[in-house]
Amino acid sequence: MEWTRTGIFITLLVVVCACTQKNKTVTDAEPDRPEAFANDDELLDYIQKTHFNYMWEGAEKTSGLACERIHLDNVYPQQDQDVITIGGSGFGIAGLLVAIERNFINREEGVARLTKIVDYLAKADRFHGVWPHWLHGPTGKVKPFGTKDDGGDLVESSFLMQSLLCVRQYVKDGNEKEKALAAKIDELWHGMEFDWYRNGDQNVLYWHWSPN
């Protein structure tokens, strides 16, 4: 009798596993990805365009900034599809400048996106001028990185500001819209209270600070 029960259990387990595999959908991340490239320049173009598209087509809709993650199956067990990465957005913003130079987008399109980003950052949560590690895209409110990490992240914000300063230099002598963008970046830059993150007169910079 015991063997019969064991056999039935194994049979049911196999059936369940088979059904699960049958219903599972595997999404090809890049169905049109070329299998070979004619030369190194073509490969480099492909890599740069793919990197750029994460920030361009894959950006969080409200902010224009980089998502912490993109799941191609659109399944987010932690409901974090709207989470923005501040440091990663810095890398993406630098990529937008490359995209303009490489004519992946025109300058006007790039400036419009960058202005949207900067306007969003000016309204989003900051802690003595410093952004948190993560933001909730639709609201601009802090998304805690950990139990005691719900405030400013100086390292991630520095990655972000490095790229914004590159943007500032790129547009500061341009047309009126570009000069206005550079001025907005200046305000954000000068608003970062690096001295606060020294915790007094200590000869250090604190990575994180939370009001809690």
Where are these regions (language model features)?
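Low-complexity, Ser/Thr/Pro/Gly-enriched N-terminal "stalk/linker" regions
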Residues: D28-Q81, H128
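C-terminal motif of bacterial Sec signal peptides marking the signal peptidase cleavage site
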Residues: V15-A18
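Well-ordered alpha-helical scaffold segments within catalytic/enzyme domains
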Residues: E30-L43, N53-Y54, G90-I105, Y120, ...
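Extended ligand-binding clefts on enzyme/binding-domain cores
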Residues: D41-L44, G129-S158, D173-N212
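Bacterial N-terminal signal peptides that target proteins for export
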Residues: M1-I8
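Bacterial signal peptide processing site
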Residues: T20-K22
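Long, well-ordered core segments of solenoidal/helical folds
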Residues: Q48-G64, A112-G129, A183-N203
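Membrane helical hairpin/interfacial module
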Residues: Q81-G90, A94-D149
